[in-house]
Each structure stands twice: as C-alpha cells, then as structure tokens.
C-alpha cells in the first residue's frame, strides 16, 4: 500500500513540476478543462485539484451527438466528478454530422473542430484564462503516426506542445498506464467510450492494429517515437527562429493603398537555405490568412529565386503573388475570398435583374441598387428612366471607353482608373455596370457615364452603392 501511495503522489508531483517548468499557470487562474469522462480527463480533473494552486476549474463535457445511448450516463458521471472536486460543470452539444457533410470532413476532423470551437467559446463566456486538455504520451505517439501518414513535415512530427497559445496539455509526459494506475490507487472510476474500439477511425486503427505490429519489431517503439519527437521539437525550434530571422531581413509591410501588401526582397531571400525559404513563404501566407499547399510554396520560392518580372501566381484564398523586378509582392487586390480552390483566375459576370443588395464574393464587395437617393458613402445617382434592366456587372475590357460625367469626352476605362490613382490589379476592384442596351452606366464606386446623369427633369433616381464586406 505504501508503494501505491507513493506512486500516485509521484504522478501528481510530476504534473506539478511540468506546470512549473513549462506552463504559465498562476494561483487563482480560471481554467476550462475538457472532460469526456474517460480515464485521462478524469485523472486530469482530480490531479489539478491536488496541486494546491487554488485554480478555478470549469469542467466542459462535449456531446458530439454520435453515441446517444451512452451520452446521458457520461454527462451525469462527469457532472458528479466535477461536483466532487468543487468545479463548475457544463455540457455542450455540437452537431458533428452536419459539419462533416457540409465541409466534407472526416468524422474525427469535424468533431475536433467543433470541440475546440466549443472550448474557445466557453473560455470567453466564463472569462477563463486557459483551456486544458488531457492528451498524454500515448496520444503523442498516435498523433505522430497520424501526421506521418498525412505527410507532415518536421513541425508536425515534433508532436503536440505542452502549450499552444491558450491551450495547455500538462499530461504529455505521462502514459495511459500511469493515469489508469493513478485512478486505481485513488479509487476513482471512469467511463469507457465504445467508439474507441471502432476500426472506422484512423486513430483507433493506429492504436489497436499498427502500433502492436510495430512493437513486434521494437518493443520500445513508444519511447523511441517520443525521443524522436523530442529531437525534432528542438530542431524545429532552431529552424523556426532561423526562418524568423530571414523573414525579418527579407520582408516588409507596405500599407500604401487600400489594402496592405507584403513585399519580399528577392536578393535577401535567395541567400537563405531552401528549408528556411519554404518556412518564410508559409509564414507570409499564414499571416495573410491564406493556407498554402506544398505546390504553392514551391512555386512561390521559384518565382522569388528564378522567376521573371511581372509573372503572377494566385492562391484560392484571393491572395495574389507577383514578381516585380527585385521583389515578390503578396497582396489581396480583390479582397480576401473565402475559398480554397487552388490557383485560379477570377472572373466576374453578374446579371442584375432589378433593385436589391447583391453579394459579390469574388471581390469581397456588395452592390446595392435602390430607388431614390439612398444613403452611404460612395453612392452614385442616375436617372431611372434611362436604366433598362437587366443590367450586367463585369470587369472592364481592354480598350473599352465611356464618357465620364464632367469630362469633355470619351475616355478609356483603364485610363480613367489610372487618373484616379487606381493602378494594376487594383483596377478590378471597380467593375463596370452595363445597361440593358450595352452602354456603361458607371464604374461602380467611382463615376457614372454622362448620359445617365440626373437632370432637372428626372422624375426618379436610381442609387448605386458599392461597399466592402467583412469576412
């Protein structure tokens, strides 16, 4: 009995030391704790109460809607365990299958996304400082193989960190066996999730099939993988710092114009190792809310080191990457477009059948057509009697002309935009609105054609609005 008592106290002490060395917890912190009812999370809940840190714990149970026969019992159990340690409790339901079908995700990925979203919302709602989950050393090994099979690089294979922003994992140095022994010695029960035995989930197949097979070749496989992850983590830290240094030397933010641009100096960039170059490109894209694929990163690296001036690449998010003499420019000439369809050309041809508000996601804008003078900055007014629906909103064509109101005669649309200090690809932010008879009514957001102007004899007006939308 003495050995058992010493062992469970050793586990608690080990977690306390991890928190002291690796996590930013302070006495009195309010913490969201993810508690499923399984051995890991129940052990975490009880260990946290034994640390004498005066933590304010909120136990959050996530009902994924996948095991309706087991959920009520688990909720009741977790609520009781939370009450036993003086923690608040809340059960949150999420619709995993709806997200899975909508976004074409696996069940595991949809559940993970909704789970962490629910934790984040709970943290805001309770005013908590951190979110804590019960990932352990066995989870770390399984995650290594999941990421390996998905093609992760060094960063992914270095494993889950003890801290990732506001997310804390204090049990990563403990095995599943450690936690089960802790519960056994403390006389604490836990729930068994039947889905952990279902072979339809990748993590289960790795745990139940792949790992036992590999352990026939190396009985110390799990320790070997953890050591490898630790080595990769240290090397990852070094590479990340080196990439940051190259990033700082070779990039700058240009805030001139309507949208900020990131400019990459090709000479400074080309002096870096290829491994660092890839990281710099990835970092630029992530900071600009784009998720680059490996192919995107390779193409942009070649553009910076070998590409000719004026060559352009475009990511599906709307991020455009262009070589301009000695630099590569990353920007959103058309606003942030929430798609992930790979590199593509943006086209615009929108039929407008009458009054209304029309979302133009291609440009992150909305067009408003309404009777009367309307309200809002940048509204253009035209004579209603001269408007023939349906209208057409599209990009201007090469050489296309119109007669701007107030100008002595016709002018090329492109030249007019240049005179208005709208240059290059930014010109696509101002498409033309075409009347039913084929004439240009307006360059939306900027100017109307003279023949559509309001006069003293105008009986009714049409207001044309052009606003940026939020994403």
Swiss-Prot record:
Enzyme class, UniProt record, top EC level: ligase
Reaction equations catalysed: cytidine(34) in tRNA(Ile2) + L-lysine + ATP = lysidine(34) in tRNA(Ile2) + AMP + diphosphate + H(+)
InterPro entries xref list = Lysidine-tRNA-synth_C, Rossmann-like_a/b/a_fold, TilS/TtcA_N, tRNA_Ile_lys_synt, tRNA_Ile_lys_synt_N, tRNA_Ile_lys_synt_subst-bd
Q: Which residues bind ATP?
A: 36-41
The record's Gene Ontology biological-process terms are:
tRNA modification
Show which residues constitute the signal peptide: none
> What does the comment on domains in this protein's record state?
The N-terminal region contains the highly conserved SGGXDS motif, predicted to be a P-loop motif involved in ATP binding.
* Chain's role: Ligates lysine onto the cytidine present at position 34 of the AUA codon-specific tRNA(Ile) that contains the anticodon CAU, in an ATP-dependent manner. Cytidine is converted to lysidine, thus changing the amino acid specificity of the tRNA from methionine to isoleucine.
Q: What is this protein called?
A: tRNA(Ile)-lysidine synthase
Which gene underlies this protein? Answer: tilS
């Amino acid at each position: 009995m003495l050995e058992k008592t010493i062992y469970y106290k050793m586990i608690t002490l080990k977690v306390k030391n991890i928190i002291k060395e690796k996590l930013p917890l302070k006495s009195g912190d309010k913490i969201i704790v993810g508690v499923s009812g399984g051995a890991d999370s129940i052990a975490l809940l009880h260990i946290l109460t034994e640390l004498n840190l005066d933590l304010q714990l909120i136990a959050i149970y996530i009902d994924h809607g996948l095991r309706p026969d087991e959920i009520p019992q688990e909720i009741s159990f977790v609520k009781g365990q939370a009450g036993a340690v003086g923690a608040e409790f809340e059960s949150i339901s999420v619709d995993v299958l709806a997200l899975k079908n909508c976004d074409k995700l696996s069940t595991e990925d949809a559940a993970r996304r909704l789970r962490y979203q629910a934790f984040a919302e709970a943290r805001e709602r309770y005013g908590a400082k951190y979110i804590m989950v019960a990932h352990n050393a066995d989870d770390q090994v399984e995650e290594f193989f999941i990421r390996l099979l998905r093609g992760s690089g060094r960063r992914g294979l270095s494993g889950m960190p003890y801290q990732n922003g506001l997310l804390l994992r204090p049990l990563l140095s403990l095995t599943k066996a450690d936690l089960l022994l802790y519960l056994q010695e403390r006389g604490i029960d836990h729930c068994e999730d039947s889905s952990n035995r279902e072979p339809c989930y990748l993590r289960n197949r790795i745990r139940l099939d792949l790992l036992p097979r590999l352990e026939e070749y190396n009985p110390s496989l799990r320790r070997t993988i953890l050591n490898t992850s630790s080595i990769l983590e240290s090397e990852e830290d070094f590479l990340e710092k080196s990439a940051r240094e190259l990033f700082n030397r070779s990039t700058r933010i240009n805030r001139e114009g309507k949208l900020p641009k990131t400019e990459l100096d090709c000479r400074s960039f080309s002096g870096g190792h290829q491994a660092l170059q890839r990281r710099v490109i990835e970092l630029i894209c992530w900071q600009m809310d784009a998720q680059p694929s490996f192919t995107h990163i390779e193409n942009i690296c070649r553009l910076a080191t070998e590409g000719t001036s004026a060559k352009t690449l475009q990511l599906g998010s709307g991020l455009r990457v262009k070589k301009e003499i000695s630099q590569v420019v990353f920007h959103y000439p058309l606003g942030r477009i929430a798609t992930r369809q790979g590199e593509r050309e943006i086209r615009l041809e929108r039929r407008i059948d009458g009054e209304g508000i029309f979302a133009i996601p291609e440009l992150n804008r909305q067009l408003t057509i309404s009777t009367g003078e309307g309200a809002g900055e940048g509204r253009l007014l035209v004579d209603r009697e001269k408007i023939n629906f349906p209208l057409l909103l599209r990009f201007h064509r090469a050489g296309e002309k119109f007669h701007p109101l107030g100008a002595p005669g016709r002018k090329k649309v492109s030249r007019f935009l240049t005179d208005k200090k709208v240059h290059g690809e930014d010109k696509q932010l101002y498409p033309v609105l075409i009347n039913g008879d084929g004439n240009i009514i307006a360059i939306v957001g900027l100017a109307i054609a003279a023949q559509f102007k309001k006069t003293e004899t105008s009986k009714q007006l049409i207001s044309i609005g052009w606003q940026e939308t939020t994403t």
